[in-house]
């Protein structure tokens, strides 16, 4: 039986998880669980969580979710947030205080898609 060599590239080894749901159960039982495992288990070299839409408000109100995100950040997950969404909910400053990279996300997400980065949406 032959051995297949797999050569990874930056885009093959990058995962972007777009989290838009305001449902804390979706965050805990799907979004955060997979995102954190992907980084801890080295399924991807780079893992980024993008906070977009109603999730921006939820994360500023839920201490349990905040701790889970801090744990992910500690383990190397990068966290970005949509500035327009954060401003809609009045939480941009809070997200920045949590260490999130709060910025306009339309162009970066489009760039991720064009470059072939793996993207999941919850």
Tell me the role of every PLM-derived stretch.
Residues 2-17, 25:
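Secretory/periplasmic and organellar redox-cofactor proteins
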Residues 4, 11, 49, 57-61:
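N-terminal beta1-alpha1-beta2 submodule of the flavodoxin-like/Rossmannoid cofactor-binding fold
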Residues 16-31, 54-60:
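Short, glycine-rich nucleotide/cofactor-binding loops
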Residues 28-41:
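Histidine-anchored nucleotide/phosphate-binding helix
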Residues 35, 46-52, 79-85:
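Short internal beta-strands
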Residues 63-92:
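A glycine-rich helix N-cap at a beta->alpha junction
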Residues 71, 80, 96-111, 117-118:
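A short aromatic-anchored loop/beta-hairpin motif
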Residues 120-122:
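Aromatic- and Gly/Pro-rich donor/ligand-binding loops
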């Amino acid at each position: 039986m032959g051995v297949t060599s797999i050569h990874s590239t930056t885009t093959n080894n990058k995962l972007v998880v777009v989290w838009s749901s305001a449902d804390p159960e979706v965050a805990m039982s799907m979004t955060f669980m997979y995102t954190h495992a992907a980084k801890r288990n080295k399924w991807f070299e780079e893992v980024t969580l993008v906070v977009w839409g109603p999730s921006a408000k939820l994360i500023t109100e839920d201490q349990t979710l905040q701790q889970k995100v801090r744990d992910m950040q500690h383990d190397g997950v990068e966290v970005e947030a949509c500035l327009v969404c954060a401003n809609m909910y009045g939480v941009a400053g809070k997200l920045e205080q949590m260490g999130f990279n709060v910025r306009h996300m339309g162009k970066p997400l489009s760039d991720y898609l064009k470059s072939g980065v793996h993207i999941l949406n919850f």
